UniProtKB/Swiss-Prot annotation:
Gene3D superfamilies: Ribonuclease H-like superfamily/Ribonuclease H
Protein name: Ribonuclease HII
Family matches, as NCBIfam families: PRK00015.1-3 (NF000595), PRK00015.1-4 (NF000596)
Native source organism of the sequence: Pseudomonas putida (strain GB-1)
Protein encoded by which gene: rnhB
Keyword Hydrolase attached: yes
Localization (cell): Cytoplasm
Keywords attached to this entry: Cytoplasm, Endonuclease, Hydrolase, Manganese, Metal-binding, Nuclease
Function field: Endonuclease that specifically degrades the RNA of RNA-DNA hybrids.
Length: 207
């Protein structure tokens, strides 16, 4: 038994659902849904933010190998800008649950809101620190998104995306003001919108 995590919650085809990437200024919001196998326990599950990158990577592979079912889903930047980040996150969570090849009897959602699902769902505040399946989902989502951000570092150099993963750090905000938004920046987010409008103003003044 792992302290702080209730393994009894996985015994009846319960899916844990979590997201990564609501706060960043760029990139998709990534979600995952996981149904763990009680017969194949995974040691060391915890909130992905509390684990080292090496531990997350190792657990990612183990979760994919041992879970009864898992699905990693997303909502793209265009959807975030069109719907807003909350609704886009709910959509991505919905996609993750619908993508499971086994239908869960219950979906436990990290946080205080649930997406509209075809199965019963319940929110669990700080669930990624309490429910093993949610912890597993948080790891799948974070590793997936972090890998994408590292790849974007090569496509859009100068922003430091591989380091801050899109979050509004001073380095990111300075680069955004200096270089302007990229196609993966969320224009509905205030700092990106301000940088975009500033560049449009400069362009207009040159015409």
């Amino acid at each position: 038994m792992q302290i702080g995590l209730d393994f009894n919650l996985v015994e009846d085809l319960v899916a844990g659902v979590d997201e990564v990437g609501r706060g960043p200024l760029c990139g998709a919001v990534v979600t995952a849904a996981v149904i763990l196998d009680p017969a194949r326990p995974i040691l060391g599950l915890n909130d992905s933010k509390k684990l080292t990158e090496a531990k997350r990577e190792a657990l990612f592979d183990e979760i994919c190998e041992k879970a009864l079912s898992f699905c990693i889903a997303r909502a793209e930047v265009e959807e975030i800008d069109r719907l807003n980040i909350l609704q886009a996150t709910m959509l991505a969570m919905q996609r993750a649950v619908e993508g499971l090849h086994i239908t869960p009897k219950l979906a436990l959602i990290d946080g205080n809101r649930c997406p509209k699902l075809a199965v019963p769902a319940s929110p669990v505040v700080k669930g990624d620190s309490q429910v093993p399946a949610i912890a597993a989902a948080s790891i799948l989502a974070k590793v997936t998104r972090d890998r994408e951000m590292s790849a974007f570092e090569l496509i859009y150099p100068g922003y430091g995306i591989g380091g801050h993963k899109g979050y509004p750090t001073p380095v990111h905000l300075e680069a955004l003001a200096r270089l302007g938004p990229t196609p993966i920046h969320r224009r509905s987010f205030a700092p990106v919108r301000a940088a975009w409008e500033a560049r449009e103003g400069v362009t207009d003044s040159l015409i």
